Amino acid sequence: AKQLAAVAGLFSDNKIKNGDKFLVTDAWNPSILSIKYMAELLNINVEIHAIWHAGSYDPTDILGLKMNKSWSYPTEVAIYNACDYNYFATEFHRDMFIENLSITNDSKAFISGQPYNYLITDLLSTPTNKSDIVVFTHRLNTDKQPDIFRHIASILEDEYNIHSVITQELNLTKEDYYATLRESKVSFSCSLHEYLGIGMLESLYCGAIPIVPNR
């Protein structure tokens, strides 16, 4: 809301000019429609670039599970059409978006991948010291199925004396988080939905063996 108010102030102060570009790093953002509204009302030609992470168009995402599609689908289509460039990490996610929302003009949908190079520099250069730990790096949402991991973790602890860590349940700094990954032997995922997969990639770079669903 504060960002939208700041952008509205820039329009009001005549600081937004023809050719200006907006990059919105999560497309599910009301600012996009507001930017489009203000720009067209004031006859200012701007470009809007947006990154789609997830939405109600994905039946396994939290929005897909909770949102009423009678309004969420038209809203996602409106956001897509308001943007000049819509970015998706993979062909799979772009195609899901286009198919489930019945997008007729796919010329605005681009596969961008994600910039992971910084992880290689930051993580691969640090030595690891492994312990018998299985780590769960994901959000505690239904699409990540944390209860499945908790069940497995209890068996590992009781029968094999293997410790498990759910990072989202701990108040870790980034440095502590990476230290946990470097100490863990295995990184576990049972996610129904994965977009960036950054937690598994971080785990891999920290030397943890990834275990993921066979989908």
Q: What annotation goes with each model-predicted range?
A:
Residues 21-26, 40-62:
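Active-site proximal beta-strand in glycosyltransferases
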Residues 1-39:
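N-terminal pre-catalytic "stem/leader" segment of glycosyltransferase-like enzymes
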Residues 192:
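Aromatic "clamp/platform" in nucleotide-sugar-dependent glycosyltransferases that forms part
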Residues 81-124:
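Donor nucleotide-sugar binding/catalytic pocket of nucleotide-sugar-dependent glycosyltransferases
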Residues 178, 201-205:
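Short alpha-helical segment that forms part of, or immediately flanks, the ligand-binding pocket
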Residues 209-213:
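Short hydrophobic beta-strand element within catalytic cores of glycosyltransferases
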Residues 65-86:
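Membrane-proximal helix-turn-helix segments that form the acceptor-binding/catalytic region
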Residues 116-157:
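Conserved donor-binding/catalytic core segment of Leloir-type glycosyltransferases
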